A protein has these predicted regions:
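Helix-coil boundary/capping segments in enzymes
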Residues: 1-151
């Protein structure tokens, strides 16, 4: 049974993508990719609730590949409905794997979501005011492309 079993149409107006380390760079035009550093998650809180243990010395991209594999594991998928409100951040179904998002909405019983980034607002603002208008526009386009692709 869906989390929202009221029979009402629900549109979630505050959903977030959990960006992977290279999400923005992967969505950027080639001219800007090398100028966009990967996310580093310096506080570590973002990764603490993930479905795997991250080794502080592990390459983050490799760690996220392991995390994506965990999200596809039969036992993990089988527990999604029961755990939909318990899984947070990168552990949440549909948090960073676009193909899982429709399934998460179905479990939640939501008709749609308005999706925002989680980690890039301050960076986008900094780039907007950096004086490099081409880079600011390039990163904004990468952001919008990434959000659109995810949804």
């Amino acid at each position: 049974m869906a989390y929202n079993s009221t029979g009402l149409v629900v549109h979630d107006a505050d959903a977030h993508i959990m960006e992977t380390p290279t999400w923005l760079r992967d969505n950027a035009d080639p001219a800007f990719r090398d100028r966009i550093d990967a996310l580093t998650y310096p506080g570590g809180n973002e990764l603490q609730q993930s479905a795997i243990e991250f080794d502080e010395n592990e390459d983050l991209v490799a760690g996220f590949e392991r995390l994506a594999q965990r999200h596809q594991a039969p036992d993990y998928v089988a527990a999604e409905e029961a755990e939909i409100m318990l899984r947070k951040n990168y552990a949440a179904t549909g948090s960073f794997i676009a193909e899982d998002r429709p399934r998460a909405l179905g479990i939640l019983g939501f008709a749609s979501q308005l999706v925002f980034n989680t980690f890039y607002n301050s960076r986008l603002c900094e780039w907007e005011h950096s004086g490099d208008i081409d880079f600011a526009i390039g990163t904004a386009r990468a952001h919008n492309r990434g959000i659109s692709e995810f949804c």
